[in-house]
């Protein structure tokens, strides 16, 4: 599939994935709205989009998201962001769909499939059958015959009547249509402020566009409630043994002594007969830990981001460096699970200041004290450390990233 911006031929079939909702019925989550909740190690929306990315019958994809969700979207999609056109949605699903259809106008597809972003189990077989049933004057609606007995209630909550279920179907998505007629139908509804249609087939019906019903898929469920998401996650984890993306980075730094009256280690000033020589504040512990965090993203080292040749970092507090590295980790969805710093030094003694260093690292990284380890050892009077010419530090960071280790 080509990125829309690079398309050189008219697309035959496009897909609009509607994912701009707030998902209030699914409850609140630190991961964001339900389309960004994780099932089987990946975001719901990422799994939904993958079905269309992998479908050779689909030429172009537009995804409609909430204006506030761009960071969540990029974090969820990662590698596939460049192949999909992203547009901001509106206040309702109907308005978001219209905006998605409008985004395709310059690419003039012959047909368009419109799909809920929270139906992550759409199959290649269903997509194929939808395409096989497309016609220039008809839409296609996957649906399942209603199997439950339907009751209509009276105003007092008692049963008024049993509704015959013969000929009744539960609609699914993707719903597919000739592109121009369904866009025109949405534009007409918008022009007269009609926003009460519950799906695109209803708008097509309103405009006398024939819609053919085909058999849907029982697996093609919509994730509406928090329990739906939990069940989807359980289902995927039963079907697939995944290896979480846990990464470990190491860092090493050394600074020599020069005349002075204190050293700064892990953000804590410690009185000493000398200070450490460096372009910044020479905090050897934070420098090593900054490199360790950057290593978990393959993001170079501290010199890449803060070159010692740059005068703006002269005398700078190393807190700036480690918070920058932590932000890089978090922007990629990473969670810092553990950090460990070992100082190699004859003096000063680290033990009396360990608690203060731990507290400082907790504040800089936003993690609990039991995820921070600070240790020290001597060099048994060997080498430059043994001669009290400087201090070295070794740091290790463990970070958990979204997704899993690829096979």
UniProtKB/Swiss-Prot annotation:
Record key words, sorted: Isoprene biosynthesis, Lyase, Metal-binding, Multifunctional enzyme, Nucleotidyltransferase, Transferase
Record carries keyword Zinc: no
A Pfam family matched in the record: YgbB
Recorded metabolic or biological pathway in which this protein acts: Isoprenoid biosynthesis; isopentenyl diphosphate biosynthesis via DXP pathway; isopentenyl diphosphate from 1-deoxy-D-xylulose 5-phosphate: step 2/6; Isoprenoid biosynthesis; isopentenyl diphosphate biosynthesis via DXP pathway; isopentenyl diphosphate from 1-deoxy-D-xylulose 5-phosphate: step 4/6
Residues bound to 4-CDP-2-C-methyl-D-erythritol 2-phosphate: 253-255, 279-280, 301-303, 377-380, 384, 387
Region (2-C-methyl-D-erythritol 4-phosphate cytidylyltransferase) residue spans: 1-246
Catalytic activity: 2-C-methyl-D-erythritol 4-phosphate + CTP + H(+) = 4-CDP-2-C-methyl-D-erythritol + diphosphate; 4-CDP-2-C-methyl-D-erythritol 2-phosphate = 2-C-methyl-D-erythritol 2,4-cyclic diphosphate + CMP
PROSITE patterns for this protein: ISPD (PS01295), ISPF (PS01350)
GO molecular function, one term: metal ion binding
EC number: 2.7.7.60, 4.6.1.12
Binding site for a divalent metal cation: 253, 255, 287
Residue(s) at site: Transition state stabilizer: 25, 34, 279, 378
Signal peptide: none
SUPFAM superfamilies: IpsF-like, Nucleotide-diphospho-sugar transferases
Annotated spans, 2-C-methyl-D-erythritol 2,4-cyclodiphosphate synthase: 247-407
Top-level lineage group: Bacteria
Keyword Lyase on entry: yes
GO biological process: isopentenyl diphosphate biosynthetic process, methylerythritol 4-phosphate pathway; terpenoid biosynthetic process
Cofactor dependency: a divalent metal cation
CDD domains: CDP-ME_synthetase, MECDP_synthase
Residues the UniProt record annotates as site (Positions MEP for the nucleophilic attack): 165, 222
Sequence similarity: In the N-terminal section; belongs to the IspD/TarI cytidylyltransferase family. IspD subfamily. In the C-terminal section; belongs to the IspF family.
Record function comment: Bifunctional enzyme that catalyzes the formation of 4-diphosphocytidyl-2-C-methyl-D-erythritol from CTP and 2-C-methyl-D-erythritol 4-phosphate (MEP) (IspD), and catalyzes the conversion of 4-diphosphocytidyl-2-C-methyl-D-erythritol 2-phosphate (CDP-ME2P) to 2-C-methyl-D-erythritol 2,4-cyclodiphosphate (ME-CPP) with a corresponding release of cytidine 5-monophosphate (CMP) (IspF).
Name recorded for this polypeptide: Bifunctional enzyme IspD/IspF
Source species of the chain: Brucella anthropi (strain ATCC 49188 / DSM 6882 / CCUG 24695 / JCM 21032 / LMG 3331 / NBRC 15819 / NCTC 12168 / Alc 37) (Ochrobactrum anthropi)
């Amino acid at each position: 599939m080509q990125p829309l911006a690079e398309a050189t031929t008219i697309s035959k079939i496009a897909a609009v994935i509607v994912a701009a909702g707030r998902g209030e019925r699914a409850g609140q989550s630190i991961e964001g709205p339900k389309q960004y909740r994780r099932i089987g190690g990946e975001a719901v929306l990422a799994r939904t989009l993958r079905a269309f990315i992998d479908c050779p019958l689909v030429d172009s994809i537009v995804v409609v998201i909430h204006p506030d969700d761009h960071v969540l979207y990029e974090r969820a999609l990662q590698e596939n962001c460049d192949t999909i056109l992203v547009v901001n949605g509106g206040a309702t699903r109907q308005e978001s769909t219209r905006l998605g259809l409008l985004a395709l106008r310059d690419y003039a597809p012959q047909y368009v499939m419109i799909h809920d972003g929270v139906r992550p189990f759409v199959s290649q077989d269903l997509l194929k059958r939808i395409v096989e049933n497309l016609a220039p004057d008809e839409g296609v609606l996957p649906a399942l015959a209603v199997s439950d007995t339907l009751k209509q209630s009276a105003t007092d909550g008692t049963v008024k009547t049993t509704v015959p279920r013969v000929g009744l179907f539960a609609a699914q998505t993707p719903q597919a249509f000739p592109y121009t007629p369904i866009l025109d139908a949405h534009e007409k509804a918008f022009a007269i402020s009609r926003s009460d249609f519950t799906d695109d087939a209803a708008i097509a019906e309103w405009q006398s566009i024939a819609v053919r019903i085909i058999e849907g898929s029982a697996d093609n469920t919509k994730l509406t409630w928090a329990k739906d998401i939990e069940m989807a996650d359980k289902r995927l984890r039963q079907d697939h043994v995944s290896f979480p993306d846990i990464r470990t980075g190491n860092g090493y730094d050394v600074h020599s002594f020069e005349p002075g009256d204190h050293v700064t280690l892990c953000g804590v000033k410690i009185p000493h007969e000398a200070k450490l020589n460096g372009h910044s504040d020479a905090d050897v512990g934070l420098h090593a830990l900054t490199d360790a965090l950057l290593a978990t993203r393959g993001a170079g080292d501290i010199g890449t981001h803060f070159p010692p040749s740059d005068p703006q970092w002269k005398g700078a507090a190393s807190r700036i460096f480690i918070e920058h590295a932590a932000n890089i980790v978090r922007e990629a969805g990473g969670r810092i699970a553990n950090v460990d710093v070992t100082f190699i030094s004859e003096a000063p003694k680290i033990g009396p200041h360990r608690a203060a260093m731990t507290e400082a690292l907790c504040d800089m990284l936003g993690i609990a004290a039991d995820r921070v380890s600070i240790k020290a050892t001597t060099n048994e009077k060997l080498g430059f450390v043994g001669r009290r010419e400087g201090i070295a530090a070794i740091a290790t960071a463990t970070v958990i990233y979204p997704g899993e280790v690829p096979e």
